[in-house]
Amino acid sequence: MFGSAHGDTTSSDTSGRRPLRLVVLPLLLALSSCKVDLYTQLQEREANEIVALLMDNGVDAVRVAGKDGTSTIQVDEKLLAFSIKLLNGKGLPRQSFKNLGEIFQGSGLIASPTEERARYVYALSEELSHTISDIDGVFSARVHVVLPHNDLLRAGDTPSSASVFIRHDAKTNLPALLPKIKMLVAESIEGLAYDKVEVVLVPVERSAQEQRSLLEPDLAQASRPIPVPLLAVAVGVGAAVFAVTCYLLFIVLGHRRRQLTGELSRVQERPGVSALAAIRKKIPALGRR
């Protein structure tokens, strides 16, 4: 009898582990929702802007803060290509610019006048490009500065000039700011005249999905599909609930079966007593059937 009881216990433990696996596996699948890194080493402000844009277009994006103060954007692996195209159309992440301090930091070597002049021109271009990129509606901007090396002893000097390239949202009335942009560039460079600044504006149309989300925000919100990670979590939770229910039912039936087995064993030890009759006494419902 002891051997039989030990065998029943071992079988019960082994069988009880299977429902536990059914509970744990869906939860693990739900928690590991196939998130991949979209962009890393981002500043917090730009990372929040990217997350807001992705979520407005139906992408479940997550910002993960790093120990160095930068942020990482994670999205579902299936939406990685769509997210990259969407952000590229918006000029995100923005190009990083160097400031004057980074360009002229001490290198320990004596630079030639030509090298110093090249650094100065490059620094002016970077600073102006960064400033223009901060204008609302501007996706990207580049400023090219030309500072000719004129001889003070010679007449007919070549004037300085600058060219500005701006890629912006077509919905933004950036042409209205054109005089101010030219004035900004002219006043930032010594010896540069206003009429020597040329600005090229390149408007970028919104995608059909973005236009629909802007014109019909309520409809877009109502018809937005459930993000894949949330759907995986819902399926995992439902499977976990079903597995727990099956596990509890399995325990109840196993306990009931062990009770009947114990009753049958005790009846078999009594001489002259019918096993079926003893069980019917214990379970009146079976006798009535």
Curated annotation (Swiss-Prot):
Classification via Pfam families: YscJ_FliF (PF01514)
Predominant location category: membrane
Lipid bilayer topology: Lipid-anchor
Keyword Transmembrane helix among record annotations: yes
InterPro entries membership: AMP-bd_C_sf (IPR045851), FliF_N_dom (IPR006182), T3SS_SctJ (IPR003282), YscJ/FliF (IPR043427)
Location(s) in or outside the cell: Cell outer membrane
Transmembrane annotation, as ranges: 233-253
UniProt KW Lipoprotein keyword: yes
Gene3D superfamilies: 3.30.300.30, Hypothetical protein rpa1041
Keywords for this protein: Cell outer membrane, Lipoprotein, Membrane, Nodulation, Palmitate, Plasmid, Signal, Transmembrane, Transmembrane helix
Lipidation (S-diacylglycerol cysteine): 34
Protein's GO biological process: protein secretion
Family of the protein in this entry: Belongs to the YscJ lipoprotein family.
Protein name (record): Nodulation protein NolT
Species annotation: Rhizobium fredii
Gene symbol of the encoding locus: nolT
